Amino acid sequence: MNKLIRRAVTIFAVTSVASLFASGVLETSMAESLSTNVISLADTKAKDNTSHKSKKARKNHSKETPVDRKEVAPVHESKATGPKQDSCFGRMYTVKVNDDRNVEITQAVPEYATVGSPYPIEITATGKRDCVDVIITQQLPCEAEFVRSDPATTPTADGKLVWKIDRLGQGEKSKITVWVKPLKEGCCFTAATVCACPEIRSVTKCGQPAICVKQEGPENACLRCPVVYKINVVNQGTATARNVVVENPVPDGYAHSSGQRVLTFTLGDMQPGEHRTITVEFCPLKRGRATNIATVSYCGGHKNTASVTTVINEPCVQVSIAGADWSYVCKPVEYVISVSNPGDLVLRDVVVEDTLSPGVTVLEAAGAQISCNKVVWTVKELNPGESLQYKVLVRAQTPGQFTNNVVVKSCSDCGTCTSCAEATTYWKGVAATHMCVVDTCDPVCVGENTVYRICVTNRGSAEDTNVSLMLKFSKELQPVSFSGPTKGTITGNTVVFDSLPRLGSKETVEFSVTLKAVSAGDARGEAILSSDTLTVPVSDTENTHIY
């Protein structure tokens, strides 16, 4: 126990003296004197404290030998450096300086050595942060001869060894071993210092962006059907591409829903390996080839383009119908239907459907299926440039304006295709105006009255217009009064009625004239009928016997 106390006191005291010596505060002779006194004092204290209790001994020891634990770390035994056989020095102990700034340095020396026999001094520098230009200086002990060092160096004129380490990383250690040979008895003081510049490292990652663009689109498309293109943009480089922009002019013959002619897509920054997809949709307005070109650009880079060419096809079917503009009812009329394929694709399952208005009767339609007023033809295929012709014979039973509607439906690689046409015929009727004249009393005595009734009937299928009636009587009869659908005038033995503007088909009107028998004889009454339809007036005569 006494031996341990002596060793601890000696180490702490010697370390303090060595620190003062290295800093230049103590001269060599003074350091040796202080070391000798410290060792003697430690021996005396160890003997005096033997009779005291352990608790009191520790208390007195701490009062008489104060140590700054922050500056000097506890002593640790080194794992011996130097030869294992025939060593003339004691076990190594280490003095550690806690420098929490740049570099931590420790120094290990043996407890004792033999005059004339070399012993090692081990210096270890540990980087607490990245440092450069690390300089370690070792003050050789006085009255000792330098033998060698690892790494090798040469003592300076004032007995110092200097090593320079270009760089010492954080946590990295650098070890130096110095062998010296003591020349006389006494304490060999040695001190080491370190100086380092902290290193700050900044990393700038340099790379090259590489923006590539590809485009996907159909080889063929249909007129007025949506065409979709996919624009794929990828950064295949090693750096971020800044301000990536894709421009897509609208191809000639295309239209975009926005109405713009150039579409611009701002993608912003793209990291290495990042992929973006843009979808654009156009409506083709004309047949032919159309090329969609997409151009990508970015900050500091070259522009890249990708294009896709699409052939715009028109699955077109056309139909027309021709017939008489007008005709008389019950007279047959022929319609000619023409179907053609002016497009680029084969039309399949072609159906031609002709629908007639009610009141029109189908008389004949070669190769068609007839159902009431509907006529249907079917064709399996209609090649581009090919045309077909069909005829249908019809007749209207009543006058009027009737329309004949034709619709053609077909299928193609671009979907269904439809076309329609119509023809209107005005069917005219024929007016047939007839007249009938009768007297109500026959024979008649002089002085009595009789009535002539005139019935006018349009037996035709069309109206008659401006129907006029005039009656002439012989001298035996004197007109007294009249009635009818229009006004009349009596002039002597003649009665004239105003014209009837319209006499419809199957319509009948009646005129009447009251006559007085004024003299005996065989009297006559003549009715004369005229109209726009009657190119020559029609007359009818009635006789009346008067006695």
From Swiss-Prot:
Entry function: In elementary bodies (EBs, the infectious stage, which is able to survive outside the host cell) provides the structural integrity of the outer envelope through disulfide cross-links with the small cysteine-rich protein and the major outer membrane porin. It has been described in publications as the Sarkosyl-insoluble COMC (Chlamydia outer membrane complex), and serves as the functional equivalent of peptidoglycan.
Chief location category: periplasm
Quaternary assembly: Part of a disulfide cross-linked outer membrane complex (COMC) composed of the major outer membrane porin (MOMP), the small cysteine-rich protein (OmcA) and the large cysteine-rich periplasmic protein (OmcB).
Bias-annotated ranges (Basic residues): 52-61
Stretch list, region Disordered: 45-84
Listed GO biological process terms: regulation of cell shape
Keyword Signal: yes
Pfam families linked to this entry: Chlam_OMP6, DUF11
Removed propeptide positions: 23-40
Gene Ontology cellular component terms for the protein in this record: periplasmic space
Record NCBIfam families: B_ant_repeat (TIGR01451)
Keyword Disulfide bond belongs to the record: yes
Basic and acidic residues bias (residue ranges): 62-79
Protein name: Large cysteine-rich periplasmic protein OmcB, serovar C
Signal peptide: 1-22
Subcellular location as annotated: Periplasm
Lineage: Bacteria, Pseudomonadati, Chlamydiota, Chlamydiia, Chlamydiales
Organism for this UniProt entry: Chlamydia trachomatis
